[in-house]
């Protein structure tokens, strides 16, 4: 995660790493590969130490149909708090802007030319990488188009900084970004990309490297680059840690759901009871967190300080329309305990996406109900959500939600 969240539309599903790999061919032909943490239902674009940690509450169990799920079409009701006045979100589009949900006010983001095809956002430490979408046609459906300009928008910035040209962009390990280029017309499923690490000011942070053919950078870590196959084959979907200077291949991970510069979280294949595995790359310490029975992890995102992992839990049910109850929960990396985010027990068709807000410790989610679209914000330890309602025609169509 990720995320550009637009009002309306069909929900995409599936864990984080496969979203990247599966979308690569389309993203390259459109120009840049977008890094999503976690996944939103719309693919046009993608905190600090918490003041307190709520005591773990009871975990809701799976229901038949939508029993126990937030009432629709009214959305989240009951006791809520006003949206924090200083909490703003970027909005994508032909002219990206800052959006203040508390008041509905918008402010322009300087330094960006108008782009009819819109912009894509990639979350990085301290801000976002931005790149124009493109409708350029290439020789084949999965071939790379011409590289395009990458910009950096700081969390507190009012304008962008130009970084360089690339086909793909991914966050680095220490406040940097990785820019990857392919020859125009090359097929990234078989070609090797050339990547260079740059600072948020656009200065080179090292020599360029040639990636293994058929692999793409998901993010930089303290132990090398986390790579994903551009076109994974059934039964071989695995990410790998890769150090260009190391003679031996790095470790592989199947079912990655989230990654930061210092941690990787994944869910091994499971049947009755799933467990999230977390590897601390700095210490080598593994951690196992059990999930509630009859649940699976749909998406996840680490907080900026790495102390919390937000997860979207999906619960089994017998709903005729395929929608399932979901709930947002936080995993404390210090204790391994789960804490339910209050008032987020909703239908999977309602939860558009979620992520950590920039420059703060709040978890933000967008929820689309029949008659309204709501933004929810929650600081760990708070007893209730802060809610803002998005008004059609008065709110941006595509919001970038956190990490």
Language model regions located:
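Extracytoplasmic intrinsically disordered, low-complexity "stalk/linker" and propeptide segments
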Residues: 85-87, 101
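Residue-level marker for isolated small/hydroxyl-bearing positions within beta-strands
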Residues: 90, 131, 180, 228-229, ...
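Loop/turn-rich, solvent-exposed surfaces of beta-rich toroidal or solenoidal domains
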Residues: 297-329, 346-355, 365
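Hydrophobic membrane-insertion alpha-helices, especially the h-region
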Residues: 22-34
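Blade-terminus and WD-like Trp-Asp/Gly-His loop motifs, strongest in beta-propeller folds
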Residues: 75-85, 119-129, 168-178, 217-226, ...
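C-terminal region of N-terminal signal peptides and the immediate post-cleavage residues
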Residues: 14, 31-59
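Terminal targeting segments of Actinobacterial cell-envelope proteins
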Residues: 1-17, 27
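Surface-exposed loop/turn elements that mediate protein-protein interactions on large endomembrane-trafficking
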Residues: 50-75, 92-115, 134-165, 185-215, ...
